[in-house]
Amino acid sequence: MWAVLPLLCAGAWLLGAPACGAAELAANSLEKFHFQSWMVQHQKKYSSEEYYHRLQAFASNLREINAHNARNHTFKMGLNQFSDMSFDELKRKYLWSEPQNCSATKSNYLRGTGPYPPSMDWRKKGNFVTPVKNQGSCGSCWTFSTTGALESAVAIATGKLPFLAEQQLVDCAQNFNNHGCQGGLPSQAFEYIRYNKGIMGEDTYPYRGQDGDCKYQPSKAIAFVKDVANITLNDEEAMVEAVALHNPVSFAFEVTADFMMYRKGIYSSTSCHKTPDKVNHAVLAVGYGEEKGIPYWIVKNSWGPNWGMKGYFLIERGKNMCGLAACASFPIPLV
């Protein structure tokens, strides 16, 4: 079936159909080659009908990648596991479908006046950050941001790095205005863990990537929250202090189409908003730095280690890029 697709396009061209010009046919032939190589790499198989749909999405993404990388941007795009998807599909499967406006969150973090170190990376300070995880086709990014921050907080306080149960938050944290695979906020998840008196480990409450019934067992809780530090809305300097002096910080931001194919470099965008009502993805700031005069955050994502920079990305710091300073928080562990 695969070899038939260019012939179908060629037939349409011979019949005078406008959909397939000669130049487009040549491009599609090359894109098909790249797509089939990508399919082997990612172990993808499709029905004949889906193959054509995925090929078109892949070709569109590949053109966008090449056009973007030919221009003068601070970050590069590249093929990844999402390359056969449209951005609309990514939004449905991986981002929040339930709006999460954190503007009503009451801040309680009072920052000092600095100065702060010019750079920080908790990954290099010791065994304080768990490996990059993969949320799968579930808008549960907020649970990974939550566990990532608390895992680090416990490790910094005790020297022991736990692996915590995202699935418990998916299944059990609804009473704190979280919505499982439809979205949630780390600040609200920290409050759930605090009042629930604990969270289990991922070994005893494994991740399934779908909504389920709550199976929390208090006797198996391994991490606890004493309090939650909510950083003042849009106070990015307070985020710097928190990461420098205390802990990796959970935050949310708005993902737009140009982020989907991020490969490396310092991400910035003119297509996203800076307001708290537009954020749709939660992540974890594990450090910060500056490159060629551009300050950035070092951010742990939850799309697996093969996305971006081994599962991480850099995003421009100091401009509330895509609303990243709207929903920042971190837990104070009870140890």
UniProtKB/Swiss-Prot annotation:
GO cellular component term, pick one: lysosome
CDD domains the record matches: Peptidase_C1A
Signal peptide annotation: 1-22
Location(s), subcellular: Lysosome
Keyword terms: Disulfide bond, Glycoprotein, Hydrolase, Lysosome, Protease, Signal, Thiol protease, Zymogen
Propeptide regions on this chain: 23-97, 106-115
The reaction(s) this protein catalyses: Hydrolysis of proteins, acting as an aminopeptidase (notably, cleaving Arg-|-Xaa bonds) as well as an endopeptidase
Similarity-based family: Belongs to the peptidase C1 family.
The protein's role, per its UniProt record: Important for the overall degradation of proteins in lysosomes.
Protein name per UniProt: Pro-cathepsin H
Organism taxonomic ancestry: Eukaryota, Metazoa, Chordata, Craniata, Vertebrata
Gene: CTSH
